[in-house]
């Protein structure tokens, strides 16, 4: 699969002009495969490669994890080139059109209290403000294929990092791109920056607190039906150069949940108000006003009902929901690929580790898109294919188990030929007979 996607060639191209061991691609492949199949430390990955899997070309890695660290150092030096070459190799093969980029950030924390410049305290999206962290950014296509990954010190702000992301991807010549992001990126400076050279943006907006948003919400108009649960309408606010287009999206499923939640809070309000029945006059009015001004309860007494205001350029409602693919990618990075714990202290190794996880994520997304199966199902199914080594008087032979129908379907969907039954031998036809006798 890796070869079919052109990853070795892409890494080889990034290696051009560098004095490197020609086996660096195999070493990086081992690290990516380990991350996708059995995430472990670099030292444990050596044992995994030697004892648990059949990986041609990586038999002589030895027992020193420095072989991995040297490859990771190269990966960091050529990070941008490797990611660019790998992505375009995948995009060309799968005919992916990069006209929409969905971007979001997450964080991963470290089991230490040291704040050392890259591992910094900041706003934790893992709900661990007591630990230093690193911020990770991910750009994803509308098909869910990751385009590129970034990492920043743990105190980096969303409003700043997206400008760096835009500037770096501009060098990739992706033509005209629609940027989709959450409301944390929706500053006026970011809009102006991203719309340079004809770019477009689709950002979420706060329901309240911004005059244009309030004006958009108050504007009458009919909703168009996108799906059974999603209705949208278009609203224009402002004049001249400041004129902005909004899409008011009404999610009926969320509106129903909001109504149920609002009902529970109203019941609580009624209970609280009934408790004030003994009060009268100004005291009662003051108590009621305090309840109705409650920062949590009062929001269920104003215009909400599942409506979301987003600033857009095209295909707004459906594209914004595509941010769920980015969130899913972050979950897979942390849970399936086990981004944490990070066993590295140096900034360059942490960055390289994150890039390795990105490469593994790209491979599993391609596999999922091609097969229609989740990666855990694919991995479990293919893990049932085993290789056995048989020895006898005539020599040695390594042979795999028969391919099951489920395995064959996965290989066919990925356009991968079935591996040879006989994986390795030393005395050709005589060994087969000897192996059969020893079995």
Regions found by a protein language model. Give the residues of each.
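Short, compositionally biased segments
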Residues: 1-2
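Anion-binding and metal-coordination hotspots
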Residues: 9-439
